[in-house]
Amino acid sequence: MVARASRDSWDEATGVAAQALALQDRAASLAQVDAEAWEEALSALRNAGDGEGGGSDGARRDHELERKLERAAAVPLQIAELGADIAALAAQAGELCDGAQRADAAAAAALAAGGARAATHLVVVNLGVREGDERLARARASEQAASEAAERLLASIR
């Protein structure tokens, strides 16, 4: 919206608007994938608790649970990274758009940073992720990048 409203005064606005739409499509897709991954992980956790015995069935069940927990952590990581991308694009738009649109760009950056933070929390609490896990570092870096982009833009319009 910010870029589209600034087309008359900002040469790159059309390209930024196209990028924003692509990010919006990614977000919608990831929301669906995240819901599916979470449901699959919950189901696998329930099945692991219901299972009896060990042997090959137990090993197969454990492997399946691990695979589903991995996916349940991977999707929020992608969402955290997407949040950083959105916050960065919103910050760029806020710096270059019409002045009347800057507050909307700052709000978009802040919302994206909040989304990155929430997604990072989901990576942190996922049972398949432990301290020192590279995914945790990536999620935290994305959260920080999103937060910094939003704060930079918010500070510039206060």
Where are these regions (language model features)?
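N-terminal glycine-/lysine-enriched basic segments
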Residues: 1-128, 134-158
